[in-house]
A protein has these predicted regions:
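Nucleotide-activated chemistry modules centered on ATP-dependent adenylation/adenylyltransferase
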Residues: 1-139
Length: 139
């Protein structure tokens, strides 16, 4: 971990990425020195973290699409594991598009900045904005 010396913080991108790799192979990250791993919440926290990175146009590691591919390959085995429900979002996400993360609208509204940021969370507003800017809706 880059954030905490001598242990894993379980909250930085490197920890999330390593836990995701471990989870993608069907293992429990607690067995690999990630003491704060939660079968119920870690996948959701990971998704929200990456959503904010994408929203702020911050670069994340190029490994995420490979992790997603590995999850798809192991999906049948992973569906049996207790963390699958909080982790299955990774199969559908486009890591460059914050809106593909499937983050619930109420969470997006709570964390959006300003009225324009809140309005931009609604699909109809994005379509209106695209029409105003001359962007084709079918793109």
């Amino acid at each position: 971990c880059w954030e905490v010396q001598g242990q894993n913080c379980c909250k930085c991108e490197k920890c999330y990425r390593t836990m995701a790799n471990i989870m993608a192979e069907g293992e429990n990250p607690k067995r690999f020195n990630f003491p704060l791993f939660s079968e119920k919440n870690t996948g959701i926290q990971m998704r929200n973290y990456l959503y904010h990175k994408a929203l702020d146009k911050e670069k994340v590691s190029d490994n995420w699409p490979f992790i997603s591919k590995r999850v798809l390959e192991n999906r049948d085995k992973l569906k049996e594991l207790p963390y699958w429900d909080s982790f299955k979002w990774i199969c559908k996400v486009n890591f460059a598009d914050p809106y593909s993360f499937g983050v619930p609208l109420n969470y997006r509204l709570k964390h959006a900045k300003g009225i324009r940021g809140k309005l931009s969370q609604f699909k109809f507003y994005r379509k209106l904005h695209d029409m105003k800017c001359g962007i084709s809706i079918n793109d």
